[in-house]
Amino acid sequence: SGPKSAGGPAVLIDPMVDGLSLEPLYDLFRHKATVKVFHAARQDLEIFFHDAGVFPDPLFDTQIAAMVCGFGEQVGYETLVKKIARQPLDKSSRFTDWSHRPLSEAQATYALADVTHLRAIYEYLTAQLDKTGRASWVAEEVAVLLDPETYITRPDEAWERVRTRSGSPRFLAIVRELARFRESYAQERDVPRSRVYKDDALIELASTKPLTEGDLAKSRLLLREGRRGDIAAGILAAVKAGLETRDLPKPAPDEPGRPGNAALAELLRVLLKAKADAASVAPKLIASAADLDAIASGGRDLPALSGWRAEVFGNDALRLAAGEIALSAQDGAVKVVEVH
């Protein structure tokens, strides 16, 4: 244990200790009367889910709450500590060797600082959410974090997460096979996808269509481990399957790039910025660039068009796309104008 947070002593738990059961921690995660406060919880939750099939519930994510409360996009913990707790954060141990045991006193202090300020930040942000009536907005986002589907990637669907510029069905078929192999390989060996090959390497492979290990050797982006052995064999088999299949994927109907979409997407970006500024919410929490392109191309089954996002932005985005409203610059600000 170490320095106290507002609610009592802060404690370090070392999951690398041989034979240590994390079940008491997971029991706390399941305890419904105790709110678990995290900052940027998603990666932590993915670990807990795959390790034990458990989520800390109820959960409060200070990064999401801060984005709803006007602190900007993907606001860092250090920023919140400075602005809300008004404390400095010693980052000198950030890049030390965390696998070495025992941890140094400086490392322990650094690790404990990740929680010692969370209570003050939580209390401040919940008070802000109560004032603005936006607690339900945060609850919507947390519900996504606590949904097992958020962390399950099925190999057959992995290609849908790869961003591509080409809508060629044959190219997409090769992307699909390469993504399927990568996902299966990563899951079987419990390694990150990027350790197999990154998205940019996947796109390069789908474009160059290597058929031999000699072809793989010419890749600019493939890691050395991917040029031989099981990964190389998997890549070559995936490319061959993608070239030979008759089951060609169809580009999504809301795929960006159809004629006339670019201008509308730009108008939607202006509307998003204006609406986000007016609501003091980070724009990226409302809609991504891909969401705007999809709306401009006719996509309607999108998070940006439902729930609290529809109130803030989505409803007017659809009206703008339908020509029912226009945008006007007035007194240095963007205004929505009804079209009669």
Report the location of each language-model feature.
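Short, surface-exposed recognition loops or helix-turn segments adjacent to catalytic cores
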Residues: F60-Q63, S92-R101, K131-V142
